[in-house]
Curated annotation (Swiss-Prot):
This is Small ribosomal subunit protein uS11. One of its GO terms (cellular component) is ribosome. Part of the 30S ribosomal subunit. Keywords: Ribonucleoprotein, Ribosomal protein, RNA-binding, rRNA-binding. Located on the platform of the 30S subunit. Belongs to the universal ribosomal protein uS11 family. Residues 108-129 are annotated as: Disordered.
Amino acid sequence: MTEGKWAIAHIYSSFNNTLITITDLTGAETIAKISGGMVVKAARDESSPYTAMQMAMQVAEQAKAKGIVGVHVKVRAPGGNKQRSPGPGAQAAIRALARAGLRIGRIEDVTPIPHDGTKPKGGKRGRRV
């Protein structure tokens, strides 16, 4: 794992959009970043797995051009008061990064989890289905 430069791929995936940012190992310098809206025109397609795949391919090309050989992946969902499961684009993005020729180090879930934060929406009796 020592040969070549490694980076961190931050993948934020919700049901509305997917964002991929590649930074150096400290997280200070941004190497490449992209969002669903930069790839597709329709807002409904921003979170789709196909869009995430296209985004990952573009970001991987930019990273490889700057000498990155592998990435550690940090997957994040909206978290907090919102859903804690990543959207449909997360898994597709990780697969596409691997297929684009980048080595995958460790995959980590960094979804923010509240330690009894704000009140969830839905009122006193919750969401009645």
